[in-house]
């Protein structure tokens, strides 16, 4: 009887071991940052056209996402990644987590947003530039994101390095810290929890976000509650790619092609408030007023992969 039980158990284990291979032929898995959004219609369109079931895993901000993929690169958790950006791409390249090349899928300009109503009610002049945020008038009014885990946070850190130089950028951060800046772990926490302009419940009227974010805050009167500071922003490019050792490379190829298609890219502005890379994709008309691209950008041409750890160490010495 014990022998029979052992044989049955072995058979069950054998069948269980075969299951993932069977699933790989019918399912493709996408891992993305928490801000990734896709409509039910797009999911249905992809599944019908490709024949693959789509599974989505969300893995935090771009920094957390990239770090998790590095830790699991020998046994990847997905077939395709969406959301590694130009601030964390160096980590992906250094660790060989991508099969082939990362392909640009969208872009957005990292810049500060402020709550117009908050400033109007208090008759306070809002900042004209992120350089103003160290002034006493804006004490304890600003929330940024951690450059160790957040791609907008690392983007803004690079912006300050580009603006002040390797030897002087720390002084800006010391002054910002002394002026009561709040540091959130990621963009979603900063924007939806701490920023007053997104929900009305946050305690900070200035937040590190994107030039397109005010388009998400249009009120019934046709005006946006928020505005963006459009000078000296950081152009953040997000990428999509097939993970090395992906279980379903055929499905991965189909999914990457779909994410770059005109059909899916048309949905990106309204769902994720980013600019699509497909030139045929349609940009919402209201974006020209409420979500324009930055007037000027700075920092994205730096060698972030080479200097990232040194900058982060200097930043951590101020905030830890």
Predicted region positions:
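A bilobed periplasmic-binding-protein/Venus flytrap-type ligand-binding module shared by bacterial periplasmic
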Residues: 113-118, 236-251, 267-271
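Early extracytoplasmic/lumenal segment of secretory-pathway proteins
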Residues: 18-91, 199
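A structural signal for short loop-to-beta-strand junctions that line the ligand-binding cleft
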Residues: 76-81, 96-116, 130-132, 140-147
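Ligand-binding pocket segment of bilobal, Venus flytrap-like solute-binding proteins
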Residues: 159-231
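Periplasmic-binding protein-like
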Residues: 140-148, 258-282
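Short beta-strand->loop
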Residues: 99-105, 131, 205, 218-234, ...
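Short, low-complexity disordered leader/linker segments with a strong preference
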Residues: 1-28
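Periplasmic solute-binding protein
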Residues: 86-96, 104-125, 149, 153-163, ...
